[in-house]
Amino acid sequence: FLSLIPHAINAVSALANHG
């Protein structure tokens, strides 16, 4: 579970950066 957190944050960060 803890391993998924950074991955989810990275995905959200990528979307925010693209926006």
Swiss-Prot record:
Location relative to the cell: Secreted
Disulphide-bonded residues: none
Modified residues annotated as Glycine amide in this record: G19
Main localisation: secreted
GO BP field: defense response
Gene Ontology annotations for the cellular component aspect, listed alphabetically: extracellular region
Tissues showing expression: Expressed by the skin glands.
Entry keywords, A to Z: Amidation, Amphibian defense peptide, Antimicrobial, Secreted
Nucleotide-binding keyword on record: no
Transmembrane segments annotated in the record for this chain: none
The family this protein is said to belong to: Belongs to the frog skin active peptide (FSAP) family. Phylloseptin subfamily.
Summary of the function given for this chain in its UniProt record: Has antimicrobial activity.
Protein name as catalogued: Phyllospetin-H3
Originating species: Pithecopus hypochondrialis (Orange-legged leaf frog)
Gene (UniProt): psn3
